[in-house]
């Protein structure tokens, strides 16, 4: 534990003094402490297994970083809903939900403008699917129909007229639980929470540097182990369409590289039987090419249980089934009963 102890000692005894600016900027604890939610929703680091510390070349960030050749949409292309009240940001009236298909089914009870439950004797009118429960004990949780779907989540955002308390700003408001990065016995670093997490609850975003596909390929080729690099690269390909009118969505998708800069979810391990899933989340429709990667719980997660998601979202590698060359495949160490043995 000497290396961890030495690092924490320098943080607590020296980084508040003058003359330590460079060291302070490179300190993981100082980076974490700079998070705006640190005092109420801290991220902590614990190692009770060995003498390892977090990688020296890694930096904690609180928002994505746009790499060379990646740009947000200009202000003239931005737009949001004009809902005067937060209660209007649902179903057919909100511009932010315009790209969703009509849906005549719902697992959510209906309430009127006064918060009273609506008892229907006739079928519900067709309406646009709403991602979150907005009333009752499940308010703010992802609706169950989304849990096993590949549907994107469309949210209101900073260009909208509704308030930050709008029920359709769950990811926009950010992480609401503390997280702990801890050393596992056999899989490096992992992540857990000291509080229980409800099924459907938003956990956090996967952050990193957003780069072009060419840059992603270059980084793969320069990586000592290319498969290891793929653990940290996630394609933003949810809306890739060769027939799109938006040239940014026509070609190869951008990718998020979280290896050297990211948030705490960079240390979340894979499982073939995960308790979280990753979803494409869209704020401003003009920025679909740089949509968020949002992690939601798909099970009730007890406090202290390791947080995991499926890196390949249930896709089995054909090499395992066909008896192909497995020497160059990445073995899975999740240990679950549903383990597929290989990642890719």
Swiss-Prot record:
Main subcellular location of this protein, as a coarse class: nucleus
Binding-site list for S-adenosyl-L-methionine: 311
Localization terms from the record: Chromosome
Binding site for Zn(2+) 1: 81, 83, 89, 94
Inactivation phenotype: Reduces H3K9me3 levels to about 20-50%. Slightly though significantly affects fungal hyphal growth and stress response and impairs wild type-like conidiation. While it does not affect the biosynthesis of most known secondary metabolites, results in an almost complete loss of fusapyrone and deoxyfusapyrone.
The Post-SET domain, residue ranges: 328-344
SUPFAM superfamilies: SET domain
Biological process, per Gene Ontology: methylation
Binding positions (Zn(2+) 4): 272
EC numbers: 2.1.1.355
Binding annotation for Zn(2+) 5: 332, 334, 339
GO terms under cellular component: chromosome; nucleus
UniProt entry tagged with the keyword Metal-binding: yes
Binding site for Zn(2+) 3: 89, 156, 162, 166
Broad enzyme group: transferase
Annotated binding of Zn(2+) 2, by residue: 81, 96, 156, 160
Molecular function in Gene Ontology: histone methyltransferase activity; zinc ion binding
Keywords linked to the UniProt accession: Chromosome, Metal-binding, Methyltransferase, S-adenosyl-L-methionine, Transferase, Zinc
Domain SET: 177-312
Domain of life the protein comes from: Eukaryota
Role description: Histone methyltransferase that specifically trimethylates histone H3 to form H3K9me3. H3K9me3 marks chromatin regions for DNA methylation. Plays a key role in the regulation of the biosynthesis of the gamma-pyrones fusapyrone (FPY) and deoxyfusapyrone (dFPY).
Family listed: Belongs to the class V-like SAM-binding methyltransferase superfamily.
Name of the protein: Histone-lysine N-methyltransferase, H3 lysine-9 specific KMT1
Gene: KMT1
């Amino acid at each position: 534990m000497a290396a961890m102890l030495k690092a924490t000692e320098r943080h607590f005894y020296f980084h508040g003094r003058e003359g330590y600016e460079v060291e302070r900027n490179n300190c993981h604890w100082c980076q974490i402490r700079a998070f705006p939610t640190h005092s109420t929703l801290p991220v902590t680091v614990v190692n009770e297994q060995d003498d390892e510390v977090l990688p020296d070349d890694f930096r904690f960030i609180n928002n994505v970083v746009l790499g060379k050749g990646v740009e947000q949409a200009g202000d003239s292309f931005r737009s949001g809903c004009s809902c005067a009240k937060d209660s209007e940001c649902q179903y057919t009236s909100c511009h932010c939900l315009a790209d969703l298909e009509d849906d005549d089914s719902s697992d959510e009870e209906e309430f009127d403008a006064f918060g009273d439950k609506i008892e229907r004797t006739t079928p519900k009118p067709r309406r646009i699917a709403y991602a979150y429960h907005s009333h009752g004990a499940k308010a703010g949780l992802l609706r169950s129909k989304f849990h096993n779907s590949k549907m994107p989540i469309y949210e209101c955002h900073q260009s909208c007229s509704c308030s930050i308390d709008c029920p359709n700003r769950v990811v926009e408001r950010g992480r609401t639980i503390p997280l702990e990065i801890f050393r596992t016995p056999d899989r490096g670093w992992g992540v857990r929470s000291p509080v229980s997490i409800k099924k459907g609850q938003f956990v956090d975003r996967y952050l990193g540097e957003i780069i072009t596909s060419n840059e992603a390929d270059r980084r793969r080729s320069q990586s000592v182990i290319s498969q290891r690099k793929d653990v940290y690269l996630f394609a933003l390909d949810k809306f890739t369409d060769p027939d799109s009118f938006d040239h940014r969505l026509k070609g190869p998708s951008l990718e998020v590289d979280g290896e050297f800069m990211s948030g705490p979810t960079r240390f979340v391990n894979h499982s073939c039987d995960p308790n979280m899933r990753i979803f494409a989340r869209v704020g401003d429709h003009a920025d679909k090419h740089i949509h968020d990667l949002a992690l939601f719980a798909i099970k009730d997660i007890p406090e202290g249980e390791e947080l995991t998601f499926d890196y390949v979202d249930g896709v089995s590698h054909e090499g395992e089934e066909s008896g192909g060359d497995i020497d160059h495949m990445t073995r899975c160490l999740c240990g679950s009963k549903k383990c597929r043995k290989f990642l890719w």
